[in-house]
Amino acid sequence: MSINSNLGGLSHRNMILSDKRILEEIDKGHIIIEPFKRECLGTNSYDVHLGKHLATYRSRVLDAKVHNEIDGFEIPKEGFVLQPNTLYLGVTMEYTETHAHVPFLEGKSSTGRLGIDIHATAGKGDVGFCNTWTLEISCAQPVRIYAGMPIGQLIYFVVEGEIETMYNTKANAKYNNPTTRPVESMMWKNKF
């Protein structure tokens, strides 16, 4: 099935990659997903799963100008019950690299129907992002979650124009250190 390259004035360059195109970009090394499972590839997205590590902030009152420390823990085999009014930091099982496209992480509809939000505002990645994804998890009511459950989906947009500085080469990039654990806010590193 082909899509008209000019839909409603939008250039084909502003479109989301299809399943076939995602596979082509993986073959070229422009997109890396580890581990990659073919059955997780959707029509125009790739399903990602909740890793085994969660964290919560030590303080109930967070301060944007200071380093807010977190306490990490593993999700037990019997699952973990999320509570409303608590921000949990989670992490994807999948490590990803994106060298030519803008990745967006969105929750799966089945996750949303359980009342779970997987990101507060940080759904967009940058070209050159090479890491697992930290999730900002909250819930509408108590809900039990499990390591390995499908939690979100990555979609990829084509970038128009040449990239001057990839995220993984930016001197001031705050989330470049590879990790399999959630990473707390680094807002305190900004000058304001």
Where are these regions (language model features)?
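DUTPase catalytic domain/fold
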Residues: 2-192
